[in-house]
Swiss-Prot record:
<dbReference type="GO" id="GO:0006412">
    <property type="term" value="P:translation"/>
</dbReference>
<comment type="function">
    <text>This protein is located at the 30S-50S ribosomal subunit interface and may play a role in the structure and function of the aminoacyl-tRNA binding site.</text>
</comment>
<dbReference type="InterPro" id="IPR008991">
    <property type="entry name" value="Translation_prot_SH3-like_sf"/>
</dbReference>
<dbReference type="InterPro" id="IPR038657">
    <property type="entry name" value="Ribosomal_bL19_sf"/>
</dbReference>
<dbReference type="InterPro" id="IPR018257">
    <property type="entry name" value="Ribosomal_bL19_CS"/>
</dbReference>
<dbReference type="GO" id="GO:0003735">
    <property type="term" value="F:structural constituent of ribosome"/>
</dbReference>
<dbReference type="Pfam" id="PF01245">
    <property type="entry name" value="Ribosomal_L19"/>
</dbReference>
<keyword id="KW-0689">Ribosomal protein</keyword>
<dbReference type="InterPro" id="IPR001857">
    <property type="entry name" value="Ribosomal_bL19"/>
</dbReference>
<dbReference type="GO" id="GO:0022625">
    <property type="term" value="C:cytosolic large ribosomal subunit"/>
</dbReference>
<comment type="similarity">
    <text>Belongs to the bacterial ribosomal protein bL19 family.</text>
</comment>
<keyword id="KW-0687">Ribonucleoprotein</keyword>
<protein>
    <recommendedName>
        <fullName>Large ribosomal subunit protein bL19</fullName>
    </recommendedName>
</protein>
Amino acid sequence: MSIIIDRINQEQMRQDHPDFRPGDTVAVHIRIIEGSKERVQLFQGVVIKRQKGTMDASYTVRKISHGVGVEKTFALHNPRIEKIEVITRGRVRRSRLYYLRDLRGKAARIRERSLRR
């Protein structure tokens, strides 16, 4: 039984997403269907949480919109997500960045991670 479930999960999993971590700024392109119309909406912000797993893997992105903090949680293997772009790589020392909810302005900045390769 477990082999069948694993095989179904492998078929449903997406492999085209980039490698990103908490602290990275990402732009998530989401396909939205309203009635008969279909459009792509962009949600750009900082990844504050990454929940690992197989099919139930998810991540939370936070942005400030008109002075109000907005957080959205996305399933990693969601078929409605067109693509995920990594804008900048952030350098943080925590895996859950919930403390950013209390910070405003310059205090909420995240240092950029240098890529040494």
